[in-house]
Amino acid sequence: MANHEQIIETIKEMSVLELNDLVKAIEEEFGVTAAAPVAVAGAAGGADAAAEKTEFDVELTSAGSSKIKVVKAVKEATGLGLKDAKELVDGAPKVIKEALPKEEAEKLKEQLEEVGATVELK
């Protein structure tokens, strides 16, 4: 069986789409989910529920150690050219995309975090 280092090296070479497929396959195979647990807040009042945010800005706070992979992921997600995507990553913290629906924002956040970026939803 391959050792851990070989597995990690193989994962490092994968594209964002390949990593996404791998995560889905692992979730199906082992019956687990990669989603972070969500803390449930107590009922504070009806106004809070009505004011729940529906649009989010995805902010890249740090590219981490895999800057090249993060630039590629930002380029794919935004449709920017390579130079513009690199400048956006170099200028972190920066908003990558604005006013995204919650599901789309969380998906983009997950994709960027998979390649080593630190991302916040605002």
Curated annotation (Swiss-Prot):
GO terms for cellular component: cytosolic large ribosomal subunit. Gene3D superfamilies: 3.30.1390.10, Single helix bin. GO terms for molecular function: mRNA binding; structural constituent of ribosome. SUPFAM superfamilies: ClpS-like, Ribosomal protein L7/12, oligomerisation (N-terminal) domain. InterPro entries: Ribosomal_bL12, Ribosomal_bL12_C, Ribosomal_bL12_C/ClpS-like, Ribosomal_bL12_oligo, Ribosomal_bL12_oligo_N_sf. The keyword Nucleotide-binding does not apply. GO terms for biological process: translation. It comes from the Bacteria. Keywords: Ribonucleoprotein, Ribosomal protein. Disulfide bonds: none annotated. The keyword Zinc does not apply. Homodimer. Part of the ribosomal stalk of the 50S ribosomal subunit. Forms a multimeric L10(L12)X complex, where L10 forms an elongated spine to which 2 to 4 L12 dimers bind in a sequential fashion. Binds GTP-bound translation factors. Forms part of the ribosomal stalk which helps the ribosome interact with GTP-bound translation factors. Is thus essential for accurate translation. Belongs to the bacterial ribosomal protein bL12 family. This is Large ribosomal subunit protein bL12. It comes from Staphylococcus aureus (strain MRSA252). The lineage of its organism: Bacteria, Bacillati, Bacillota, Bacilli, Bacillales.
